[in-house]
């Protein structure tokens, strides 16, 4: 190839690059301005908890104004805690929406990995026969912002705020073993069961509750005859409907409790701890219910330990 042909080819390459790149050196009117995105986490009391380590990982779906996915970003715990910005540049859309979900489990990440439209984005609990696995400490948030054009200079930095989407539950049942023994002999390995429900099993990407009703099985232990659950998480109920705690023995539902002895209902509060204390000893059933801050168990429930 002679020099003249090389020159012509070079000019054609530059012209094509200019047509598809959108940014011509003499005119930046079609150029999107680069910008940076950070994630900020809040608790239920609107305290900034970004640096506490509560957020272990974040997946951020980026949608254009039509709802079409144009990007998918991941951040780890260290990046979130350090408030590390993500450098971004999107050429084409007039606005973008960042839909961020923190602490999804591997199943949720796998289910959402290939979602191409915001209307198809769901965070569904794993469940078997209507019994759901307790979710992780989920956060989510949405930020919609315009894409700035007309310059290659740094654009406006953006922050997507994320908030908790689950409630915690802690259960103590005093005299549980004695109550079981009083209701018949142990004939089967699954002679006893405790279920708490119901809640929807699905969040949309925009944090709307939908889906099927599910229950949760607290994975507790019997200590000194009392049932004590670990702290576990649930999705909230629809329209602040109370949860029902059902106690089974030998395949039969023997107790169904949804309020404290004072009439306070078992309503899970997003970002808070629902404490349920049941005393099966004595002639009268005694039930206490309280709501405390995240990770704070009602200490009076341990007064007799």
From Swiss-Prot:
Gene3D superfamilies: 2.60.40.2100. A lipid is attached at residue 23 (N-palmitoyl cysteine). Pfam families: Mfa2 (PF08842). It comes from the Bacteria. It is found in: Cell outer membrane. A lipid is attached at residue 23 (S-diacylglycerol cysteine). It is a lipid-anchor. The keyword Lipoprotein applies. The keyword Ribosomal protein does not apply. Keywords: Cell outer membrane, Lipoprotein, Membrane, Palmitate, Signal. Anchoring subunit of the major fimbriae. Regulates fimbrial length. These filamentous pili are attached to the cell surface; they mediate biofilm formation, adhesion onto host cells and onto other bacteria that are part of the oral microbiome. Fimbriae of P.gingivalis are major virulence factors. Belongs to the bacteroidetes fimbrillin superfamily. FimB/Mfa2 family. The name (major fimbrium subunit) does not indicate the abundance of the protein, but is derived from the greater length of the major fimbriae. In strain ATCC 33277 and strain ATCC BAA-1703 / FDC 381, major fimbriae are 300 - 1600 nM in length and about 5 nm in diameter. In contrast, minor fimbriae are only about 80 - 120 nm long. This length difference is observed only in a small number of strains, including strain ATCC 33277 and strain ATCC BAA-1703 / FDC 381, and is due to a loss of function mutation in FimB, a protein that restricts fimbrial length in other strains. This is Major fimbrium anchoring subunit FimB.
